[in-house]
């Protein structure tokens, strides 16, 4: 099976390194085989190394090097933010950020909830084993 995510104009990518880490950007122009011009509604248009980008499955329909206003409209029309949040990759990153923001007491409460859940599962499993044996 071949590649499905190509470096192309309109491809949405996740920045995986540097000061813009974790931001969704759109490739607006390909500079050469190693660099692309990327833009997002909340940042300046910059040249970025492709090694810093993780390409997503989301592609929006834009022309080469669009104005900021056109880019924002295209992103809203394509519903990029919701598509990202509904994707499994986006959900995993949201969960990671939420877990990283937990304090010690929150982690303690989660530990107690896991212990309680494991006890309930163990009781139900024992009940089913008794029914099968009888």
UniProtKB/Swiss-Prot annotation:
GO terms for molecular function: mRNA binding; structural constituent of ribosome. The keyword Ribosomal protein applies. It comes from the Eukaryota. InterPro entries: Rib_uL2_dom2, Ribosomal_eL14, Ribosomal_eL14_dom, Translation_prot_SH3-like_sf. Belongs to the eukaryotic ribosomal protein eL14 family. GO terms for biological process: translation. This is Large ribosomal subunit protein eL14z. It holds the Pfam family Ribosomal_L14e. GO terms for cellular component: cytosolic large ribosomal subunit; endoplasmic reticulum; mitochondrion; plasmodesma; vacuole. Keywords: Ribonucleoprotein, Ribosomal protein.
